[in-house]
């Protein structure tokens, strides 16, 4: 039986529609209504967001990528953006998000794709790629991870994890007050004045009430800090399968990233993917797309051109 879901409209305002003028599209995946945009033609580039963002995070990527002759697909994960938002935690799991993404991309018959993976879009997109290698051409990995995390390391990096897991504080701050989409994102960009003036209300407005914000504080509970965690086996699988993969891979890092610092996490990814290029560094904290979106898009274009052999 389908669970109840919250629905959302695009936050009003000229800035949103100027920066995100794309036709909204929807597919039914695993009983949920999933939103995405599909622009341009050519080999597809799939841009994947995490928590608490939505496709709007990639607004500075679409034009540079389509201008280079690429098809750009930007889904909103179930629970975010314009996709349906299940109001029960049981509807959410990493395996479920991988299955939802798989359902969408198979319906679109996506092949030869480049998966651009950020935050929870990392384990989700990598889960798709490793399960569907015949549909994937290359990987772009930034500010994410794909293995179980030691508790001490994770707590040191992401203090709010403790709030998210507290029985009352997480729902109160992140659910009732939308703290992750507001203050959390604000603290995770470099140019905070621009973000506050232009974009912060867009991320807050797409999650308008506590029911719509469920995933902002429940999804982090799937981060595997020990072998009893719900997502531990899936992250073990990701780590193991990445070692076997041969996808051309570009690593991108924000110089100021406080969540997944490029030295620690790029080193780990290069241990798993010794053929990976990078890390290519840009101005940015965790949400590096906000500060350096167009620059990252051009790095992706250059990386894919090198794969094609069209540029040195």
Placement of each model-derived feature along the sequence:
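Flexible "cap/lid" subdomain of the alpha/beta-hydrolase fold that forms the substrate-access gate
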Residues: 2-25, 32-36, 57, 80-116, ...
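Conserved HGGG/HGGXW glycine-rich cap/lid loop of the alpha/beta-hydrolase fold
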Residues: 37-82
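Short phosphate-engaging motifs
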Residues: 44, 54, 180, 212, ...
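Short hydrophobic "strand-cap" motifs at the C-terminus of beta-strands
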Residues: 48, 252, 284-285
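Short amphipathic alpha-helical segment that frequently serves as the phosphate-/nucleotide-binding helix
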Residues: 52, 266-267, 297
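Catalytic active-site module of serine/aspartate enzymes centered on a nucleophile-bearing elbow/loop
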Residues: 275-312
